[in-house]
Amino acid sequence: MKKYLAIIIFLIAAVGCSKDVLAEQPVGDINLKPAPGSVEMTDLNESVFSILNLDYPGLGEVKSFCEAGDYANASVSLLDYWRTRAVYNPEVDILSPSVSAGELNIADQATEEGEWRFKVAVYTEEGESGSGTEKFWSFKAEDGSINWSTVPSGLENEKEFLSQKHRLQWMVPQAKAYAVTKEFKYINAWYTAWISYNTAFPAPTGQTDAVEWSGLQPACRLNDLMNVLPYYIHSESFTPQALANVLVSVYNHVESIRANPFGIGDSNIILTQQQAIVTAGILFPELTKAGEWFSEGSAAVAKQLNDQFNEDGVHNEFDISYHLGAVADFISIYKTAQVNGRVAELPADYTECLRKAAGFIKNVIYPNYSTDNFNDTRSARMTKSVLLKNLRKYSEMFPDDAEMKWLATEGAYGTKPAATLVSYPVSGYYMMRNGWTQNSTMLIHKNNYDTANKWHNQSDNGTVGLYVNGRRFLPDAGCYTYNDGSDRRTYASTEMHNVVTKARKSYEKREGRLLLAENTTGYEVLVTENPAYSDLTIRRAIFFVDNSYYVIVDEAYGDCADTPINLNFKLWGGKADNESGKGYTVIDGFSDNSLCVHSTFDDDNNIIIKSFSETTDNIGAENSTGYFSNEIDTKVQRCWTRLNVDKKSGKAVRFISVLLPFSGDFSSQSVEAEFTDNTPETAGTFHPEGVSLKVTVNGTPQTLSYRLNQ
């Protein structure tokens, strides 16, 4: 409350000094100071008065001028009103604005002086995206204007570039740059580009399939437009014409989104569209259809709250980045409604639904505030600063959650979480860890129940990601591209993951289910299963032994016969983010029924992965190099191994894999493992009720087992 009271005080003070503080050129053709008589004005979009509810409290003077036909002074009065109105956008910090070096780089390039170089997703002409020094592609035409049809060579078929260039992603960084520096070039560039864009792509009437007015494009533009207006509204460069054009743009964007809803009713796209509609209804109550927008949008948001998340709180597309985005959208809607006195009109269970969703992020991120590349996550975007920003929002939303506060403050306040085994059985995410600090060990197991085969989800049921003391040892493949084609299919294929496959084929089904999750003396155990193929089911049991190492037991059982079963491990990258892992990997080789590989980092943070097969029919091993992707159009080389065994009729193929973190010399490490629930004569027998085995690490034997309640 103190924050919003301070905002009110600031706004009142700003109104009193806004005409004297700056000496700028206007981004229109009118001196802002109101005159008692008629004001000459060119380029005024008088249609703004047809979309305003002139009976709205505070617009009396505007209405009087309109009734007298004096639209020039009506527009000046409207601007004065807008600068003092009691409507607040909590997404904007006007009291203490800040801009990062990276944002300033974006803002500077998106100007005439910067050759109209616009940020479009991760696409750059030079430099690495997100580095803060990258150079974006220029949209400058020969006459110095903006050429919105620009498509750089090589990006003609890049679907994400062709769509995201219509989201105008530089607007918010540019507004923040203006708020901090008060340099005229930023507001001038923003307004010039905005008018140019809307002239090139006027709002359609009714339905359209044009990319610039479909899907996320208009919703993202509108959400950002609503977030830049508070930064500019008190500038002497912001004219009545500018306000009129912005209000008409808001109206046209909302109406176009309403006329062109995205076809899939529970996707992240429809949520962003509804967020734009309901937010416009809150932030622009003076517009004639604001009531409709809020009513329609809030009802849709209530439905989306239930549709977007599964019962256990995980986003229905099973992707960490889209989960993060959906939670952020819902929190933004809630806070905007809250600060403007509309929160009572949202569903009563709104915050509790979000509490579960926020809890998933708390549990799925690695202890160094990073994520894996599961599905389309693109871990390069999930930086520590991004994750902390979202965790702080969660902590503010749920101040009673002491564990969230601990994470959000990097341990400065709150209570360190104690959970070591966490399950999300409806969706199929599981975490096994020995702590919550950077030097901890953590494994994520992914076995989704996804009968709809969501587009952002990959057929990787059973895969694992492994983090040890700041290093990802088994980074997920990632997606590499959003384009339909062989590259996307390659990275999404099952064999690109740490799983068991049949003849290297991708899974036919994603029907993961949890069979067991329990703590027992000396270890934790997690057992899941997926009927991956019509004739083969894959069961995976993961033991976390002595909070030290993992043992993975894979059993492939079913009717298929005389078919190779593959145990795939996709290994680590190098020490640097985009460095090959080949120079840090030793394939120790295949011997008898086992395959061993280990890492060779020079910081005493290494791992051994040794796999054993119970049966040896046509047994063999392969290894080579491949890639994983942390970001669109980037890939990192790594090694992989594959242990192959033929499955015989009436038998199962069973593997034991030991994942042993170690420091010191590799030569001093020893790992052995064997099943103890079969004899040599009964090898390959599947026991549906459970499994028993013995693992010996560095001379210390450990008996492991689980039993299911049949």
For each predicted feature, which ranges?
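Carbohydrate-active enzyme catalytic cores, enriched for enzymes
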Residues: 314-473, 520, 648-654, 671-710
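Positively charged n-region of N-terminal signal peptides that target proteins for export
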Residues: 1-4, 18
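Aromatic-lined, polymer-binding surfaces characteristic
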Residues: 143-358, 364-365, 541
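Catalytic Cys-His active-site segments of thiol-dependent hydrolases/isopeptidases
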Residues: 474-478
